[in-house]
Amino acid sequence: MKIWVYAIAKNEEQFCERFMASCAGADGVSVLDTGSTDGTVEQLRELGAHVESREIAPWRFDTARNESLKLVPEDVDVCICLDLDEVLAPGWREALEAAWTPGTTRGRYLYVWSHDANGGDGVTFYADKIHSRHGYHWRCPVHEVLMTDAPEVQRVIPGLRIDHWPDSRKSRASYLPLLELAVREDPDNDRNMHYLGREYMFYRHWGEAVETLMRHLALPTATWDAERAASMRYIARCCEALGDTRSAAHWLVRAAEEAPTQREAPYELTRLYYGMEQWALCRYWAMRTLHITERDNNYMTDPAAWGSGPYDYKAVAEWHLGLYDEALDAARAALALEPDNQRLQNNVDIIRRSNNAQ
């Protein structure tokens, strides 16, 4: 089996060595450089990659991806689309060869999009940018997707993992105009409508965000419960930012009903009522959050909902309500998840003293 990695790059010199080391085992690496002014091109070539330079104007990620795919030799069996800030975990080739049975056209694998402060997994989901050489192309100006007009045979690839270690200083300023372009090109695309609404929220354009996210929810193709619930949560964040906590709570309750197996909406309700010092409601939604024990692997998962936060909020709410035994249990559970957190240790001590004072 001939396996090839292909990528696009611009001014990513700091990632070259790590990127190429993780690609060890590939039959080749092709990179389309789109205008680096640092040493990216030279370093990649020194490390063994085939690199070509080309200006993409006007800039679109799908055009760049399609041009980079053209660099992959025609006789390759399997292509891996990888960015310079991504890392293939050791053993990837063996895992891929074991799972790629005859007739397979596309592979799904664990993608770790973010990491916590200690390097542990943050947001994780299954990605699908491993594909057969022929019959595929990229579409959408940003948040591009891999498309095919032919029948697909997909396989999950156990043991294949890609970690994303981005440069937090890198600008994403091009995303908003490209998302606006994507929606103009295909106004019925629910995925892009959701992304555009989220991007407006990131930019604190609250009114435009709410309007766009409402458009997403109204699209007949917007049926994925997790993504619909995320749009509702983002609407709630906009409402809260505008000082309308009543509407924020309304939309978060709707989100919790839309995706009852997801922790994120009840966790945000917990946080909302904590900020409002409505302790009974804060405790109720913390308990609702903790009742959900199976975590989905989708890109909208919030790691905070699966950390110490739900127990922490529950402990504080119960302390205010005079439920000291329950508060102490919750505070200890929070501390067990973050044993080096001094504030959580202080909370345990405060609640223990309150309990002893009864």
Task: Mark where each language-model region is.
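Catalytic-site signature of metal-activated, phosphate-bearing donor transferases
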Residues: 62-69, 88-211, 215
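Acidic helix N-cap motif at the loop->helix transition within catalytic regions
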Residues: 14-17, 38-47, 91
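A conserved acidic beta->alpha catalytic loop
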Residues: 22, 32-45, 56-57, 83-86
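Active-site nucleotide-sugar/metal-binding loop of Leloir-type enzymes
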Residues: 66-78
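Short, well-formed alpha-helical segments that are part of the catalytic scaffolds
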Residues: 7-26
